Amino acid sequence: MPLAFMLPPNVWLADVAPTSLYGYQPKLAPAGIFVALFGILFIAHSIQLVYYRQWWVLLMPLGALAECGGYIARIYGHTHDRLRDPYVAMEVLLVVTPVLFAAVHFTSIGRVATLFPRRYSIIRPIFVMPLFVTVDVISLVVQAVGSAMAGTSDTADDAQSGSNVVVAGVAVQLFGYLIFDLVFASFWWRVRKDRPPLLQKYESFMLAVFLSSMCVVLRSIYRVAEMAVGWDGVINTTEWCLYSFDGAFVVLAVFILNVYPVGKYLPKKFNWKYNPEVDGDEETRKALWMEGIPDADEEKMASSQPATMDTEPTSVSYTHLRAH
């Protein structure tokens, strides 16, 4: 059950304030709760970042910190609900920040897919990260521009124009996520069908990333609906909706990757075509010998990494295995 539904009604129901930029006077208690939650998640992800030293995962603590900043701006808006700057800061941070988590989802699944034989992926794993992160960046820019337009507008028409831009940005993000989920579902079905040795090591992590991504998808659906009915529509001017369908889902998405930290499961040394750290594992070497090298140039690997086993002739090459 979303966090907001567990709070007493007098805590998460806003006082109606038609002259407020929010359409109500924001409550302190729920905003404070989310500041605390995202603050804790920021600390936890920062510790894991230093411990596992996968520096690209810096996006997770940065995202948690940005969410925290968005709710701090909301707290300030409790007593300054007619000031534009804290309102714009809140909207931009809360609308745009999940894009950072999306980049982690796309990159994580792309890297995991690279560790498996190429035949499991309908899109070459080397293209997963740049393709979906590019879509992610486009949605980031569009959402940021739309949020700034709506937040700094002086008329209802200008605010609605900003809302429309935000809807377009969130729709781009949602579209990218849905395509990504289809790619992942295809990969997951094929891997589950064959059950290669590596699946046991990465199965729970892949499911965790998928669940985390679905939380962001549900949050994005809420944002599209919110902006579709207007900046001053019933969803945007109803406070508990924000905490239930945005804050709670984003907290859950970030928390899941605390329980299943990216740095713990993905190898530190990584190459999109060939991963020496993983391929050095005996079990993985055996899997590669039996199933083919994922995303590697066969001739290059045949000359530099001959595949032999005690029970087979030592002259057997990867190219020969692929032919059979």
Where are these regions (language model features)?
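Conserved small/polar residues in nucleotide/adenosyl-binding loops
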Residues: 318-324
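Helix-loop boundary elements of multi-pass alpha-helical membrane proteins
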Residues: 40-62, 105-135, 184-212, 264-271
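Cytoplasm-facing ends of alpha-helical transmembrane segments in multi-pass membrane proteins
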Residues: 40-46, 95-119, 137-151, 175-191, ...
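Extracellular loop 3-seventh transmembrane helix
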Residues: 94-98, 163-174, 203-261
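Transmembrane alpha-helix entry/boundary detector in multi-pass membrane proteins
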Residues: 26, 87-94, 132, 158-175
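Membrane-proximal first intracellular loop
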Residues: 2-98, 123-126
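Non-transmembrane, juxtamembrane loop and terminal tail segments
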Residues: 271-304
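Helix-to-loop junction signature of class
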Residues: 70-78, 143-153, 217-230
